[in-house]
Regions:
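Serine/threonine-rich, repeat-prone extracellular segments and beta-strand-based repeat modules
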Residues: 2-24
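Phosphate/dinucleotide-binding and metal-coordinating scaffold of catalytic cores
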Residues: 16-17, 22-295
Length: 295
């Protein structure tokens, strides 16, 4: 419409169709007309209009989130803290975010909790792959798969695009349902993450394969608890990578083999490469039980 456009900077009114002319060696003309996607709407107003900090910084407290259902009724309206999430994904132009509500709340039909994430899916032009992977995992016997709903996100009045609003992986009766670990116990429960970023306070590399294990919940453990898990992982890897012990099936004494098989099938069918690094892959061990793969 005769106004020079600077990507990510120029503000336009799309209440009416807008015509763009793009010139390279050839001139192209496009008319853009926006339509409502029919998805739930998420409006975040940050405290003082501040920029959302990265995951390595403190939460931006004093912010507010309002979520509208598809029929425009209010699903949730209340205070929240917000910051970025992800490691490599935080470096992309479309940022992923984490929300920490002031109190537990049911969001878009998902069970009550304080912690939620907004996945940007920037590398996926279909925007579907995470949700399809979740759907596939839900069809297996895996103990828990995060629930999620597609939404349109607005931050301080700016439309950020399509996001997947889903549950953050946490120990909870409606999420990773394991016992909380008491100080005097060592057997469980534990939520462990394997991640090459290796950025949690309590962590170790396994003795046989050098894999990066981190304690996600509890995020602090005493010496006895730390050593229990470290030795357990060592015994598991020794049973896996000793030819005779593997042939005898000794590794099955240390893991819930059905969950490991289901989890690996999902990884293979969806082409997820995260186990290769590894990044953001999980297992959990309940009191008296074997480690279970996932979510």
């Amino acid at each position: 419409d005769g106004v020079e456009q600077i990507s990510g900077v120029t503000v336009n009114d799309f209440s009416k169709p807008v015509t763009y002319t793009v010139k390279d060696k050839i001139e192209y003309t496009f008319t853009i007309s926006l339509e409502y996607s029919g998805l739930p709407l998420v409006f975040v107003e940050t405290a003082g209009g501040k920029t959302i900090p990265s995951k390595w910084e403190d939460w931006l407290e004093g912010s507010h989130v309002t979520i509208y259902n598809t029929d425009w009724t209010v699903d949730y309206d209340g205070p929240t803290s917000i910051r970025g999430r992800g490691n490599s994904t935080w470096g992309y132009p479309k940022k992923p975010y984490a929300l920490k509500l002031d109190s537990k709340a049911e969001i878009l039909g998902m069970p009550k909790h304080k912690r939620w994430v907004l996945l940007a899916n920037w590398m996926d032009r279909t925007l579907l792959r995470n949700r399809v992977s979740f759907n596939l995992a839900e069809r297996t016997d895996l103990a828990y798969t995060p629930r999620g709903e597609f939404v349109e996100l607005f931050v301080n009045g700016k439309h950020m695009g399509n996001y997947l609003l889903c549950e953050q992986i946490k120990v909870d009766k409606n999420r990773v349902n394991i016992d909380e670990l008491d100080e005097g116990e060592v057997d469980g429960g534990y939520l462990l993450e394997l991640d090459a970023y290796f950025d949690e306070a309590f962590k170790f590399r396994s003795e046989v394969r050098g894999l990066p294990y981190m304690f996600k919940d509890p995020d602090e453990v005493n010496d006895a608890q730390f050593e229990f898990i470290r030795k357990y992982v060592t015994e598991l890897e020794e049973a896996l990578y000793d030819d005779q012990r593997f042939a005898a099936g000794e590794y099955m004494d240390f893991i819930d083999i059905e969950s490991f098989a289901d989890w690996w099938i999902v990884m293979e069918l969806t082409g997820i490469w995260e186990p290769n690094h590894p990044k953001s892959t999980y297992m959990h061990k309940d009191k008296g039980g074997k480690p279970v793969r996932g979510p």
